[in-house]
């Protein structure tokens, strides 16, 4: 059975006491996955203020990552979290390039590229988010746009900095499908995940896991996860409810198949 990556992004949600209650629930609901990381890997990207309690309470079948990281070691960068701080917390995974970081906080391709390199050069597993706007999608330019995002994000990256397939994961999240209730068709998502995998292979000569994100929920996750070229999902709103998130975790091929 092919391994699936189930990742949740809490965004700016959950106070520490809420995070603690959540972790109790998700631990209980995923107990049967202990020792089964070869078929399901669960990662929760939490706000930095929740990291301590979430990481303290998590059981072995769950990983906790951070939603952002700056590419400088230290300095006068008010409000930022350096890659050294991420390492000091033993946070193995970090999100880079999410559309909300690109759009709201004006992170351009050069900043995304620096973050990718900082992560990979310092032993942090990078989940790189890419995806097109609704305008780009309607103009039929999705493939060209996303391939260009990947080229720019991976400029100067060497496969020597990638020791295993989990060091670099790409999440395809069409912007028009994030938090809107609109869902990219599973066939289109499958095709784009193949496009992305092929582009990374062309650039780095390695195969990387490619996930889909964008209004993923417990109703559509099964269809998405059964697609050949989709290695997992990056879940937003539905990851805030441990019951719903657990249903997504168990979607797709049943364990043992």
Language-model segments: residues:
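Active-site loop-to-helix "anion-binding N-cap" substructures in soluble metabolic enzymes
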Residues: 1-257
């Amino acid at each position: 059975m092919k391994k699936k990556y189930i990742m949740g992004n809490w965004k700016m949600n959950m106070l520490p006491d809420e995070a603690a209650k959540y972790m109790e629930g998700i631990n209980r609901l995923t107990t049967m996955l202990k020792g089964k990381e070869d078929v399901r890997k669960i990662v929760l990207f939490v706000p930095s203020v929740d990291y301590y309690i979430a990481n303290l309470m998590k059981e072995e079948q769950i990983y906790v990552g951070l939603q952002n990281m700056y590419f400088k070691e230290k300095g006068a960068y008010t409000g930022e979290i350096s890659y050294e701080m991420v390492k000091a917390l033993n946070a193995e995974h970090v999100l880079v390039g999410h559309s909300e970081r690109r759009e709201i906080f004006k992170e351009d391709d050069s900043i995304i590229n620096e973050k990718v390199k900082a992560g990979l050069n310092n032993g942090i597993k990078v989940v790189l988010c890419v995806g097109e706007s609704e305008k780009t999608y309607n103009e039929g330019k999705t493939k060209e746009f996303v391939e260009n995002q990947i080229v720019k994000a991976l400029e100067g990256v060497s496969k020597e900095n990638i020791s295993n397939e989990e060091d670099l994961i790409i999440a395809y999240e069409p912007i028009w499908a994030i938090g809107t209730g609109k869902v990219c068709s599973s066939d289109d998502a499958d095709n784009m995940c193949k496009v992305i995998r092929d582009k990374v292979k062309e650039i780095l000569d390695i195969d990387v896991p490619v996930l889909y994100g964008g209004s993923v929920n417990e109703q559509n996750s099964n269809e998405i996860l059964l697609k050949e070229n989709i290695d997992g999902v990056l879940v937003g709103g539905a990851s805030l409810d441990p019951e719903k998130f657990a249903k997504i975790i168990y979607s797709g091929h049943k364990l043992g198949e």
